[in-house]
């Protein structure tokens, strides 16, 4: 066997063997503890979801009152109140969005009714509308200035 500081010592293969052996032990421990289930490809997997221990504790406590299992994770009263408050705010936002959508639908119905009433215009009102449109178009054109002519300083004249 070569000495500890020898150049020809088979360091790489020994280290790789130890590394693969240690990774195998870690994998076996995780399997024994049940941390590898379910697989990422299964439908029950939560691999793409956000992991929140307080939310899991809050919702599991609300759904089942089975306190027979012993856990090391607890939910403080402060955090539970915060979760309840945030759920209340989310529910209020949802109601507000529903009310706004309903108002938009009502406004669309009202605008359709006004459009229906506008079809029954008399020839006099049609003429008035046309004249007012012409007046608004001519008044919105603005003031045109002649360029190239001006005072001796080059400023425009009116």
UniProtKB/Swiss-Prot annotation:
GO terms for biological process: ribosomal large subunit biogenesis. Pfam families: Alb1 (PF09135). It comes from the Eukaryota. The keyword Nucleus applies. It is found in: Cytoplasm; Nucleus. Residues 1-51 are annotated as: Disordered. This is Ribosome biogenesis protein ALB1. It comes from Vanderwaltozyma polyspora (strain ATCC 22028 / DSM 70294 / BCRC 21397 / CBS 2163 / NBRC 10782 / NRRL Y-8283 / UCD 57-17) (Kluyveromyces polysporus). The lineage of its organism: Eukaryota, Fungi, Dikarya, Ascomycota, Saccharomycotina.
């Amino acid at each position: 066997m070569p000495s500890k500081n020898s150049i020809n010592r088979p360091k790489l293969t020994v280290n790789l063997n130890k590394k693969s052996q240690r990774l195998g032990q870690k994998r076996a421990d995780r399997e024994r503890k049940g941390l590898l289930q379910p697989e990422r490809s299964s439908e029950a997997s939560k691999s793409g979801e956000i992991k929140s221990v307080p939310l899991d504790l809050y919702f599991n406590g609300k759904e089942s009152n089975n306190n027979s299992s012993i856990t090391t994770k607890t939910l403080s009263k402060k955090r539970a109140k915060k979760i309840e408050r945030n759920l209340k705010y989310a529910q209020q936002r949802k109601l507000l969005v529903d009310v706004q959508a309903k108002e938009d639908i009502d406004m669309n119905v009202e605008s359709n009714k006004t459009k229906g009433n506008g079809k029954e215009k008399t020839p006099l009102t049609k003429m008035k509308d046309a004249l007012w449109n012409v007046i608004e178009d001519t008044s919105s054109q603005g003031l045109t200035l002649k360029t190239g002519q001006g005072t001796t300083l080059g400023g425009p004249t009116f």
